[in-house]
């Protein structure tokens, strides 16, 4: 509503991007969900690192980027909750009503952190722990929709006097006069669609929690309808709020302040509950997803490096992971509160959200390229991510704090060291465009360019090529296991490690079932490549693909690629070499043909020269007697005496 009051119909782009993704990119979502299920990914960092050779370095980079990128998003939710609380002490929404918003934000952040720690980290397996959270998200979505529809119906028929009167109000309001900026609309639509795919919260719900691809068929039409209903009364509420409330009222709070100004306290409370539940669920799911990424891709690799080879058989890894996730939750929410404090907590909610959208959108090139292009490499993904993230920080995140907070006003206006074409919001001399469009343009353009160029100049490792084949051709490889040779592994060591990660009952159940499948009466199965792959995937659901791969590697002795996989790579290389030889042969034939054409052309040129010389000589011989005959004829004609 606040976005509509400030920018007119531009708020539609925030709903348009996700709707277009659900309607037009359902085939991409289906492939993404299939990859997530077959690879047992736990987060967007797990997806990207698993695709590019299960790289720990890449996983750490994506995790750090996600934490920093989502920090403004968490600050946005804290600001939303604290502003909503302040309304009940000042119904006009013009001041803070005597409430210390910074102090209130601290207590809100602390409460959300404690709730998330207590109820979000009781279990370890990422594929089992969030069923209740998903139900809570569905409930809060319904509550938010009901609250917004109730306020909208009250505004249209209870305040404006009916639909026709409401349309007249809209036509006469400032919102009806807003001009459409094509470049900004395009950028925001792309940005919202990218954020829909890349936000850790959305990825968690869309991919990690999705256990059936058929759910996408329902979501492809149900979710756009939900967004349409959410946006149905946004403009009427914004128009009535601008008409009824004081000029300095906060438009982000019109959903609360308009009912309160009309004496509808119950409706305002319903609206508050809808907004509060929405904000808290966003914070909880976002921090859960981020804490999983931090524990799996930052804490566990560091812990394993200190523990050495004994890390797989000693110590309770489950306790380490759970403790790391709890600490990560506290740190992540603390970072959100710190951003809220430093930025002053006074910016428009939508503007703060766009900053996070641009940050997480940097995952999109590596994600799409990894799923559709086998040529993408770890070097390319890392290059694109680092370049895009650096541009986002410089052009969007740091300027959002305001002048003279992080970046000086001189640097913002003149550029570093007076270099004008390096100004954060006029990079490379491009001036006069919207700051959001500017940040989206340069960050995604340079990110994609870095990804493509880095992939073209680097050669993927065998595991990268195997993972690339499984991602790109996921529907053909979903049921195939690749990657391990179990000759160096011991079943007893695998059992101890699995118990540390999965827990005793789950590990015993897994090993007993595998022994039965192999036809053994023994308790422990043979460490076949298929079984090693199954253990790795089960562990990846708890500690991430990269960490699980590293732990299995310690037991197997580093034999992370089987002979069959190496043969597959060799076959592929042979095919590429044969194709290259065919191209070389074709090129040689074309060169021979071109040489023959040049020889023929030279002969034709020589013949043409000879022809011209011959014609010139014949013409001279012909012209001489003909001239004489003509002269004598004229003399005979004119000379009668002769």
Cite the ranges covered by each PLM segment.
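Primarily the dimerization/phosphotransfer
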Residues: 602-638
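Membrane-interface helix-loop-helix modules in multi-pass membrane proteins
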Residues: 1-40, 49, 155, 187-195, ...
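Helix-loop-helix module between adjacent transmembrane segments
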Residues: 12-126, 187-195, 204, 277-285, ...
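Transmembrane helix-loop boundary segments of multi-pass membrane transporters
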Residues: 2-15, 77-102, 131-136, 250-257, ...
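Extracellular/periplasmic helix-exit of transmembrane alpha-helices
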Residues: 30, 34, 151-171, 222-257, ...
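Terminal cytosolic tails of multi-pass membrane transporters
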Residues: 300-306, 400-525, 529
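Amphipathic alpha-helical coiled-coil "transmission" helices that mediate dimerization
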Residues: 561-613, 617
């Amino acid at each position: 509503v606040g976005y509509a009051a400030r920018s007119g119909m531009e708020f539609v782009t925030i709903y348009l991007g996700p709707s277009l993704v659900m309607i037009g990119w359902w085939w991409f979502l289906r492939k993404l969900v299939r990859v997530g299920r077959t690879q047992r990914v736990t987060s967007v960092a797990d997806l990207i690192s698993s695709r590019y050779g299960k790289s720990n370095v890449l996983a750490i980079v994506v995790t750090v980027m996600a934490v920093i990128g989502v920090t403004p998003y968490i600050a946005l939710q804290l600001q939303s909750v604290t502003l909503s609380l302040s309304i009940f002490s000042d119904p006009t929404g013009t001041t803070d009503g005597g409430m210390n918003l910074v102090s209130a934000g601290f207590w809100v952040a602390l409460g959300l952190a404690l709730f998330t720690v207590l109820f979000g980290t009781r279990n370890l397996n990422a594929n089992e722990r969030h069923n209740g959270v998903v139900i809570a998200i569905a409930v809060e979505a319904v509550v938010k929709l009901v609250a917004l529809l109730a306020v909208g119906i009250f505004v249209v028929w209870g305040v404006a006097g009916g639909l026709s009167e409401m349309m007249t109000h809209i036509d006469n309001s400032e919102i009806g006069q807003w001009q459409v900026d094509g470049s900004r609309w395009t950028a925001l639509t792309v940005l919202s669609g990218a954020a829909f795919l890349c936000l850790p919260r959305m990825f968690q719900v869309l991919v990690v929690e999705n256990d059936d691809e058929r759910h996408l068929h329902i979501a492809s039409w149900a979710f756009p309808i939900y967004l349409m209903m959410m946006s149905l009364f946004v403009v009427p509420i914004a128009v009535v709020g601008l008409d009824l409330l004081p000029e300095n009222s906060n438009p982000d709070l019109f959903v609360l302040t308009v009912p309160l100004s009309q004496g509808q306290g119950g409706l305002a409370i319903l609206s508050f509950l809808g907004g509060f539940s929405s904000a808290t669920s966003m914070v909880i799911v976002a921090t859960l997803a981020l804490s999983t990424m931090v524990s799996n891709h930052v804490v566990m690799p560091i812990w394993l490096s200190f523990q050495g080879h004994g890390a797989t058989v000693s110590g309770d890894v489950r306790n380490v992971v759970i403790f790391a996730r709890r600490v990560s939750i506290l740190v992540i929410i603390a970072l959100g509160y710190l951003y809220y404090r430093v930025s002053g907590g006074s910016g428009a909610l939508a503007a703060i959200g766009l900053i996070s959208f641009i940050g997480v959108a940097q995952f999109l090139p590596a994600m799409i390229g990894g799923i559709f292009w086998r040529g993408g490499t770890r070097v390319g993904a890392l290059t694109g991510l680092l370049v895009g993230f650096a541009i986002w920080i410089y052009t969007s995140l740091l300027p959002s704090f305001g002048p003279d907070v992080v970046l000086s006003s001189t640097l913002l206006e003149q550029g570093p060291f007076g270099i004008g074409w390096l100004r954060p919001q006029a990079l490379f001399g491009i001036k006069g465009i919207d700051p959001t469009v500017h940040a989206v343009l340069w960050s995604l353009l340079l990110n994609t360019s870095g990804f493509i160029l880095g992939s073209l100049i680097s050669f993927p490792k065998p595991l990268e090529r195997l993972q690339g084949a499984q991602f790109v051709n996921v529907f053909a490889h979903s049921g195939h296991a690749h990657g391990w040779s179990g000759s160096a592994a011991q079943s007893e060591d695998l059992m101890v490690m699995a118990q540390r990660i999965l827990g005793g009952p789950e590990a015993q159940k897994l090993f007993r079932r595998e022994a039965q499948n192999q036809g053994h009466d023994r308790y422990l199965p043979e460490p076949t490549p298929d079984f090693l792959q199954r253990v790795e995937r089960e562990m990846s659901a708890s500690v991430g693909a990269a960490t699980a791969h590293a732990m299995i590697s310690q037991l197997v002795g580093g034999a992370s690629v089987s002979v069959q996989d190496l043969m597959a790579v060799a076959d592929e290389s042979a095919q590429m070499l044969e194709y290259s030889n065919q191209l070389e042969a074709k090129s040689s034939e074309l060169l021979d043909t071109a040489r023959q054409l040049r020889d023929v052309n030279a002969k034709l040129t020589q013949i043409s020269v000879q022809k011209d010389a011959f014609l010139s000589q014949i013409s001279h011989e012909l012209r001489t007697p003909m001239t004489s005959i003509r002269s004598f004829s004229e003399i005979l004609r004119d000379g009668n005496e002769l």
